[in-house]
Structure formats: structure tokens, C-alpha cells
Amino acid sequence: MKKILITGGSGFIGTNLIEHLLKKTDAELLTFDINEPKIDSHNRFWKRVDIREYEELREKIVEYKPDIVIHLAARTDLRGLTLKDYDANMTGVSKLLKAIDEAGTVQKAVFASSMYVCEPGYMPKDFEDYAPHTLYGESKVETERRIKKANPSYTWSIIRPTSIWGPWFGEPYDKFFHIVMNRMYFHMGKKACKKTY
């Protein structure tokens, strides 16, 4: 039976991923998050772990011996005032990479980045071409660079989700959909809205 570790398992994507895995696989799951799960039944997989705290992170990963790691833990809002406000994204991935290496059991890993490594409308020339327009985006650029520099020996990939919404979502989409559902949305002008993806 495969062992899957999910960081950020209490977040929007993590919650939906766990629900999907429970329906589609018999893999053994473990989730790390600083927040409690959104769904009570996920408590049996959850451990309160801050990925910036290396010793605890290493201890839990070495003990669990995961085959697969899906790294979703991140600060994703746009309210930070300095790049240091997004330290969980950068320092977190560095410490996770080190702990995974110490475990020596991981065969595959997926690291979540963001479409915000490039500003809306920018078409990157290659995977090293970045144009972030927010501090959050800058933190994800640095996150990607740290992963690439580490060049893990296991199979790995970086994904850049675009705007996503669905069950258990939060800011900013919950506000938008509340406006739409209450018939308070209106579109000004005749031009189409600009898409960022």
C-alpha cells in the first residue's frame, strides 16, 4: 500500500484532494497542517506540523516513510507587506526537501506553485522565465528555484494552479460567489473581462 504525505491538507486544495483520494485509492494518508481539517473525518490523517520547524518535520517524515509527497502548504493571500511575510513558502520548501532526503523513501513528489510566478497576460519563454507582480508570486518564484536547485533524485514536478474554486473554498472566491448568488453582481461596460490564465 502506497503511503502519501500531503502538506497543507487542511487547505482548500488539500481538503478536496483528500476527499478524492479516499474515493479513488486505498493509499495510506498523512497530512500536515498548522490548521485543523475542514472535515472532521480527516482528523484521523492530520498532524499539526509547521513545515518551518525542521526537527519536528524531519521526525514525522522519517517515522512515516512516505512513498509520495504532495506539497500544498503555503501562505497564499496577497496581504503580505514584505517577502519575509511569505517565509513559509520559501523556508518551508527548503526544510521539506531536506527532510524528504533524510527519509530516503520518497519515489515521487508534487510541489504546488502558482500562476502568479508570472503577471496576468505575461507569456513566459521557458520554465526559468518569471515575471511576478505580487510578493506572493515572488515567494513562489523563490520556491521553484529552491526545488530546481535541489534537483531531487526522486521523480518530481512543479504545478502552477490557476484560479480555482469549489467545495471548501475561501477568499477571495467565496465573496465573489456570494455576490453572484445574491444577484448583486453586475458587469460594467461592454468589453469582456480580462482572464489571467
Where are these regions (language model features)?
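Rossmann-fold cofactor-recognition segment
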Residues: 42-53
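NAD(P)H-binding glycine-rich loop region in Rossmannoid oxidoreductase-like domains
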Residues: 51-89, 102, 120-124
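Active-site segment of SDR-like NAD(P)-dependent oxidoreductases
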Residues: 75-76, 115-122, 130, 162-165, ...
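Glycine-rich NAD(P)-binding loop of the Rossmann-fold in SDR/ketoreductase-type enzymes
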Residues: 52, 84-95, 130, 134, ...
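N-terminal Rossmann NAD(P)H-binding glycine-rich loop of SDR-like oxidoreductase domains
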Residues: 4-24
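NAD(P)-dependent short-chain dehydrogenase/reductase
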Residues: 152-197
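Conserved Rossmann-fold NAD(P)-dependent oxidoreductase catalytic core, especially the SDR/UDP-sugar
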Residues: 95-135, 149, 157
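SDR active-site strand-loop-helix element
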Residues: 7, 32, 69-73, 109-115, ...
